[in-house]
């Protein structure tokens, strides 16, 4: 009777079991004790826009334990700028918080001339319908940029209405000048509101961490500084915004004389003056 050829796979399995015996047990890897919300709440992050969140639910507690430590981000100007929604930077070709970008929109000309149907304008506060284009908030960089960067992509690629480059008016110098004028107007308006609300223009305030000290010092080459104030109780870390680069006598009078409330300059609290401070930051960064 012919001998049957053994199945080599069965022999291999039996040999391995014989050699290793009880060591051939299935072992499950133990998961590390990870507290990062990127892992524990990954379903909330995956495929979504990542941004800083200051909601109480995010910074609060769960079962008596903090999900995230509180670094007083609500009172931090830079954290507030980073928390802005992300937009696509046409010039840099990457996604950036819109606090660091200048927005442009197209407006139909009431009286078209020379074949121009629409005009590209700068927008300080996002309002109204229509597609937008976002470019770096830097006057020096935008002066070297091509005019096409200011034109919303959807304006030229729309299936309903197509505009050729000859039909779109882009006056780059005028656009940048108007944007700067709008920011200066917003800053002046905010400072005038503070002046009307304050009982006395020289009411002194105490410095705390992440307060913003607004100065007007043309001799200081630093427009934005992060400074630790030694000698003051608590050694607070403050943000310095120097408006001296703007060369505006009205702002100089408001900051250095009429609204000065500390020996260092005009001290503003982020939570109370967030809108004004963001306009100041945008104006300084754009001017440089």
Curated annotation (Swiss-Prot):
Disulfide bonds: none annotated. GO terms for biological process: mitochondrial genome maintenance. It is found in: Mitochondrion. GO terms for cellular component: mitochondrion. Keywords: Mitochondrion. The keyword Mitochondrion applies. The keyword Mitochondrion applies. Transmembrane segments: none annotated. Its main location: mitochondrion. It holds the Pfam family RRG8. Belongs to the RRG8 family. Required for respiratory activity and maintenance and expression of the mitochondrial genome. This is Required for respiratory growth protein 8, mitochondrial. It comes from Eremothecium gossypii (strain ATCC 10895 / CBS 109.51 / FGSC 9923 / NRRL Y-1056).
């Amino acid at each position: 009777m012919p001998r049957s050829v053994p199945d080599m796979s069965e022999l291999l399995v039996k040999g391995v079991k014989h050699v290793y015996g009880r060591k051939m047990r299935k072992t499950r890897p133990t998961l590390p004790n990870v507290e990062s919300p990127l892992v524990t709440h990954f379903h909330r992050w995956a495929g979504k826009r990542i941004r800083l969140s200051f909601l109480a639910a995010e910074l609060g507690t769960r079962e008596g334990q903090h999900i995230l430590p509180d670094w007083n981000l609500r009172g931090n100007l830079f954290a507030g700028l980073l928390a802005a929604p992300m937009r696509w930077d046409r010039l840099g070709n990457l996604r950036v918080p819109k606090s660091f970008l200048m927005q442009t929109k197209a407006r139909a000309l009431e009286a078209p001339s020379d074949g121009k149907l629409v005009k590209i304008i700068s927008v300080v506060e996002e309002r109204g319908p229509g597609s937008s284009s976002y470019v770096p908030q830097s006057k020096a960089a935008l002066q070297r940029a091509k005019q096409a960067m200011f034109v919303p992509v959807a304006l030229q690629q729309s299936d309903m209405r197509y505009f050729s480059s000859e039909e779109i008016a882009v006056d780059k110098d005028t656009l940048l000048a108007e944007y700067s004028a709008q920011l200066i107007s917003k800053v002046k308006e905010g400072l005038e509101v503070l002046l009307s609300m304050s009982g006395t223009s020289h009411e002194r305030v105490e410095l705390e961490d992440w307060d913003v000290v607004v100065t007007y010092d043309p001799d200081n080459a630093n427009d934005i500084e992060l400074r630790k104030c030694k000698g003051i109780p608590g050694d607070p870390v403050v943000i310095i915004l120097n408006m001296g680069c703007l060369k505006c006598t009205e702002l100089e009078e408001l900051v250095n004389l009429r609204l000065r409330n500390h020996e260092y300059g005009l001290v503003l609290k982020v939570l109370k003056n967030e809108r004004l401070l963001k306009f100041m930051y945008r104006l300084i960064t754009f001017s440089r």
